Amino acid sequence: MRQNCRSILPDAGNLRRLRSALKELQAEVIAVPAFTARHLWRGHAIHFRCFHPEAEGIRINVMSRMRGVAPFERLWKRRTTLVLPGNATVHVLSLPDLVAAKKTQRDKDWPVIRRLVEAHYFEHRRDPNRARIAFWLTELRTPEVIVEVARQHKRAWRRLASSRSLLAFALSADLESVNRELAKEETAERDEDRRYWSPLRKELETLRHPNRGK
């Protein structure tokens, strides 16, 4: 199933434009909660499925708040704009923000994070700058590449070593320890994601079964 994930500031104008686009796509809400600004502000995802013949079966997930991710206004300022065939433009999350959004309890997200950051490194390693080096040292999840970046950029490594425990083992190429710390990072993020979603899931259960317990 194809999916399209959207982040939106749920003010009146944006919601009006989104409703118009969803109507054109013949999209319908397929699960709780209902499509309201209140649910979006609360942090819920609204799930739609398209029934227009040219988009049939596409699922659209709309959110306004994501755990560990900056508020929408900052996401918008940092966005990446892509130009598609026909000169259409699409605004997408910057790579650092996408990586932050992917740090969930879902198994499928962690290999994606690893590939995204690794691909960015191999694309830009011959043209490093301060922001890129910091991004690599704080977000890479490939032990051998972490070692490579730490050794090539020792000044940045020294500056950032205290902010990420695995960097203490990078210069010595202690891959076993780097892997151990990566596992700890992932476990901590998964646990934090579960804590974040626990009250929201309870709200969803109440919406699904409003008469339960009465």
Could you tell me what each predicted segment is?
Residues 1-214:
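Compositionally biased terminal segments of proteins
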